[in-house]
Amino acid sequence: MLVAFDFLDMNAKNITLRPGRPADAAKIAAMSRDLIETGLGWSWGPDRVARSIANKDTFTLLACDRDRVVAFAIMYFGDEHAHLNLLAVRPSHQRLGIGRHMVEWLTESAYAAGIATIHLELRAANYSARTFYRSLGFTESAYIPGYYRGREMALRMMRVLRRPGTPLPAWPAPKLPKS
């Protein structure tokens, strides 16, 4: 699967989205260490990322500029709830709409899979991430003291796609041509 999008900035015109593969684990782990886990130690190392990629309930989405990985997202899909574990965009490719397209793609996939809510955590002091997720329909649901290695508070956010326990939306039957 390769998906091309029209992004907000002409510099991003060569961006494609594709699923993560086991061979991508080291690149994704390094990006997590450098862009997300700064100052916290490294919990999403290559082995953990590789296990996530191999997990049938987790989807890893990559954004590539030609052959270079410039962004990634890892999302776990449960029965009714999904959890966006990680999202990172290289600084050289931020503010081009890449992260937004990735979260929108994952949200649409979650909705199609019957997911009721998507949850995520971020550093409570990361105000730009709060603003980003709010713009995508996420709301703040809880503060978690010491979430990051006992040192930093997390903010949990969620987006409701449908009420848990309610039936899935009915898909209209396709209209077949009359013969």
Question: What do the PLM-derived regions correspond to, one by one?
Answer:
Residues 102, 126-129:
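Conserved short alpha-helix immediately C-terminal to the canonical SAM/SAH-binding motif I
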Residues 89, 123-124:
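Short amphipathic helical patch at the helix-1/turn junction of helix-turn-helix
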Residues 80, 116, 139:
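Short acidic/polar active-site loop segments enriched in Thr and Asp
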Residues 46, 67, 124, 147-148:
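Conserved beta-strand edge residues that scaffold enzyme active sites
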Residues 2-12, 19-94, 103-105, 109, ...:
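Acetyl-CoA-dependent GNAT
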Residues 97-99:
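Conserved G/P- and acidic residue-centered "switch" motifs that form tight phosphate/ATP-binding loops
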Residues 119-122, 134, 139-156:
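Conserved catalytic-core motifs of GNAT/GCN5-like acyltransferases
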